[in-house]
Amino acid sequence: MSTRYKFSGNNLFGQWFLNEPILEKFQLVSKNHGLDFKLMHMSWSHNVFQSKNAIYVSGAWDNNENVVKRLDLFFGVELKATDLLAAGNDDFFYVVDVKRLTIWIMHHEFDKTFTFYPLDLKFTLGKMEKENNDIEIVKMIVSNKSVYFLTNKGCIFTGIPPIYLDTRHCLGRVCDVACGYEHCILLTDFGHVYTWGSGKRFQLGHGDIEDIDKPQEVDALAGIKITKIAAGGYHCLALSEFGDAYTWGWNDEGQLGILDNVEHPSIENPIQYSIPKLIDIYDENGEIVTIDIVDIACGSKHSALKLADNTVWTSGYNKYGQLGLSSKMFPSVKYFRKVYESCINFKIMCGIWCTVIETTSN
């Protein structure tokens, strides 16, 4: 199985193995040092990827740039890189063994090596479930302030040491979780969406700016089965089973991609939307596009959609070319524009200041 990536956006630290500091159109990322890699994590200054049974970091690391370095984590413990998850923020970098429930942590400024901790999730889950065997971590994400773990039992833990986040009031089992800078969003297998955290930029979708300390359902989506969620810096996207996408939160750079006035697209849209709003996509002639949306992704201040015809549409902040457009011609885009199309299937992902297209072949 071979994975290939096309990338547009910030490469200021050489994290994408390319010479140009900014890529304003999607360009194929070639193998570096002969490594066939699988991307694990994107930050604004470095990437983490798996190659065979090892984990590497590329970009800015240990006060250097254009680094490609194998991470030495394991202190003689034999592990499979396929059993590991990696993520980080400006302060800490985390690597988790999803099966052994252990974590390695490094502080970017003060640490030169990783510190090992056990994650005692089974003890906590044992208080709630009779059967707590075969627990695995299926996703790890980080916000500016914390780290979150989602297990195959649908439980969320936060912090080090991990504390159980009570989601027993949620309708269905938690199947996904995402974080912005100061807020979080989760999805259940019943298609219900819940948010919590800071609401000061309307990113929670509850119609106000109140902060919430535990997951609360987004009422405007309660009658719609949602199949995927994404979180930007201060905004969210949600994809429905019918191929519609909804968005809400901060819109200072057009990251919500909403065009309220089709006849006069130059008119500024509101800087925020406090509840989810249906996204309409328009072609270059101003005609509405009726093709289903099949994938969504969020960066810090931009968003990306994939349609069923294998096209990618982006909107929002474009200082680093993360929309796949010229940053001089389009410093920001206020509504979704088509920027890429392909005859083969692919996935879309967004880093903080980049957009990535991933294809997999045998």
Report the location of each language-model feature.
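Eukaryote-biased RCC1-like beta-propeller repeat architecture
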Residues: 1-362
